[in-house]
Amino acid sequence: MKIRADNNLGYWLFYSQRSVAYAFSEVLRQVCLEHKKPYIITPSQWGVLSLLFETGEITIGAISQRRGVDAPTITGVVKRLEQSGLVERVHDRGDRRVVKVSLTDEGKSIMDLLAEPVDAFNDILTHGFSEAEQSDFRTNLQRIIANVSAVAPGTGDRFGLLPRGFHCGELE
């Protein structure tokens, strides 16, 4: 066998993603416990909350597109956040058929509490990496995503999140 797990980039990407997700879950959990919240925020929920914190009201379809996650999955995440009192669904003023999601006061409060620990966690992840190395790393990850589309159409950048200049599925 030519490639072993310890030499396989896909393995290391998978392993690092799992490690980061687990550690991030713990950071989020600790903040909720320290502040005696009746809920625990997951990384997926934090992704939705952070987008709402940045944008205000937004549709589930837009959340799906911006976070690169299928709409039915986002619907479930939003439902759990709504049950925890962190978000609410509101009808668009201009078109009552359109439903948007927004943060409640409690949602804004938890995002304020999470800001510093999340920033500190990101600092831990990037410790020892220069700004240029961090930028190169992001670019290389984006290249990998673009390359994946060449071998598995419909995967890779199916949500169009890569910056311009990345051509999915066009390996030389």
Predicted regions located by residue number:
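Active-site phosphate/pyrophosphate-handling residues
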Residues: 8, 47, 72, 109, ...
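Hydrophobic structural patches
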Residues: 13, 49-52, 141
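N-terminal helix-turn-helix DNA-binding core of bacterial DNA-binding proteins
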Residues: 22-73, 84, 155-159
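Charged, amphipathic alpha-helical coiled-coil/dimerization segments
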Residues: 79-143
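Alpha-helical linker/hinge and terminal dimerization helices associated
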Residues: 16, 20, 27, 31, ...
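N-terminal leader segment of winged-helix/HTH proteins
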Residues: 1-39, 166-172
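C-terminal regulatory/oligomerization modules of transcriptional regulators
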Residues: 1-4, 132-172
